[in-house]
């Protein structure tokens, strides 16, 4: 087939099926590439393209943009994805800064960022949808003879048999940070378990069960647990006989028009199409790679095993996709992904930390944070109808405490958007944003 014929065929096909920012997953192109170029893709499945609503420049708000840009300059943030909803209408979506310092490529709305622990919201929504569909019960045991993950039979502490699915959702499984974060102990686990390579999720589970005791009775004490959310990913796989990533894509994201989100890789050469580059704060130490293959790496690239975090912190997304996700469980939206009971359970605990997936919930205000080296993500659903998501490709020295500064900045910035009435979720997009490839 001639090159021109192929291009015309592709354009006609995409034009026929493109509405808003949806794409198809029917066609795959393969070609060799270098690791750093957006225009040269190692592979392209349309499903991996992350199309996103893009505003006409006439709708830009100078005051809003100035607030964002001042913030990025103040904290030396290289790039950002920002989206704002009002009453479940996407009223603002824009990229700021650059994705790559070397090429100075501008950040656009379709670029993908690691969202770190904001991934837990995706996992919790998936679990609650499985409850609604009768696939799972929150009272089911995780371990033991009658547990979902019964194959892990050897355990140092029999109290592990008392851990239920609901305990994992609100970080009350009984583990403690006094033992460190199991998801970031690759070298220790490899040594103790006498593994040949870095531990995978199965190795980590076996390590915890065989070598660690619960510090609390399950269900009694909050202790933030990445390990608990990794287990939720394993539960999803066990119950569905699918990979965690594919099940979420097929049953939560794509049926609701959210295309392009994927699980992140660890190294720079594992970046997905349209994924940004990540930058640690100036003066940050270098580390030995999690797999022991490199003596010294920048922490965003190989310092931690992001991929194995999986359900606890490995998704990549843009800000428009995140607010779209929140709209699916917003109590004021006419469309509800979850039953009223499941949606309410996610935010109705006695303590604000009892929320499922959210970092916290007070009244009708819910928030979710995510922090890794080179990454910061903040999602806030406000009782006044505003929801916003901010994702950064740079980290600052204060780590997770930086999230409050993002909140303060955005709460000020959105005051400039009170009169925006557009809904970018239903605005047809320029074809170049749906099919940005060169053949």
Stretches with model-predicted labels:
Residues 2-8, 13-95, 144, 246-250, ...:
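Catalytic loop of the DD-peptidase/beta-lactamase superfamily, centered on the K-T-G motif
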Residues 155-365, 377:
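Short, surface-exposed loop or secondary-structure junction motifs
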């Amino acid at each position: 087939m001639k090159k021109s014929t192929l291009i015309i065929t592709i354009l006609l096909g995409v034009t026929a099926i493109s509405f808003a920012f949806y794409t198809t997953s029917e066609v795959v192109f393969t070609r060799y590439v270098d690791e750093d170029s957006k225009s040269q893709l190692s592979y392209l499945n349309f499903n991996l393209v992350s199309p996103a609503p893009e505003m006409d420049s006439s709708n830009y708000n100078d005051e809003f943009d100035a607030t964002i840009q001042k913030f990025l300059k103040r904290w030396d943030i290289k790039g950002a994805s920002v989206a704002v909803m009002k009453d479940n209408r996407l009223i603002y979506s824009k990229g700021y800064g650059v994705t790559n310092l070397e090429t100075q490529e501008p950040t656009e709305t379709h670029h993908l960022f690691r969202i770190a622990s904001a991934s837990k919201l995706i996992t919790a929504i998936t679990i609650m949808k499985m409850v609604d569909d009768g696939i799972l019960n929150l009272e089911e045991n995780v371990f033991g003879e009658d547990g979902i993950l019964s194959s892990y039979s050897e355990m140092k502490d029999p109290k592990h048999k008392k851990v239920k699915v609901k305990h994992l959702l609100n970080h009350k499984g009984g583990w403690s940070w006094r033992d460190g974060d199991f998801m970031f102990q690759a070298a220790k686990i490899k040594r103790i378990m006498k593994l040949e390579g870095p531990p995978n999720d199965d190795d980590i589970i076996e390590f915890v069960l065989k070598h660690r005791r619960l510090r609390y009775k399950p269900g009694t004490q909050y202790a933030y647990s990445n390990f608990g959310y990794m287990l939720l990913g394993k539960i999803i796989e066990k119950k569905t006989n699918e990979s965690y990533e594919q099940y979420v894509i097929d049953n939560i994201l794509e049926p609701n028009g959210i295309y392009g989100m994927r699980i992140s890789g660890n190294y720079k050469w594992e970046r997905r199409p349209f994924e940004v580059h990540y930058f640690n704060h100036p003066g940050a130490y270098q580390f030995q790679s999690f797999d022991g293959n490199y003596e010294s790496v920048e922490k965003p690239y190989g310092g931690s095993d992001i991929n194995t975090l999986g359900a606890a912190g490995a998704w990549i997304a843009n800000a428009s996709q995140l607010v779209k996700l929140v709209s699916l469980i917003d109590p004021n939206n006419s469309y509800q992904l979850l039953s009223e009971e499941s949606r309410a359970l996610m935010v109705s605990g006695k303590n604000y930390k009892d929320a499922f997936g959210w970092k916290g919930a007070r009244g009708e205000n819910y928030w979710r944070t995510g922090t890794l080296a080179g990454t910061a993500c903040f999602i806030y659903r406000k009782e006044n109808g505003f929801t916003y998501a901010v994702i950064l490709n740079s980290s600052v020295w204060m780590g997770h405490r930086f999230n409050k500064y993002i909140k303060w900045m955005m709460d000020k910035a959105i005051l400039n958007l009170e009169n925006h009435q557009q809904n970018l979720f239903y605005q047809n997009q320029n074809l170049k944003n749906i099919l940005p490839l060169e053949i």
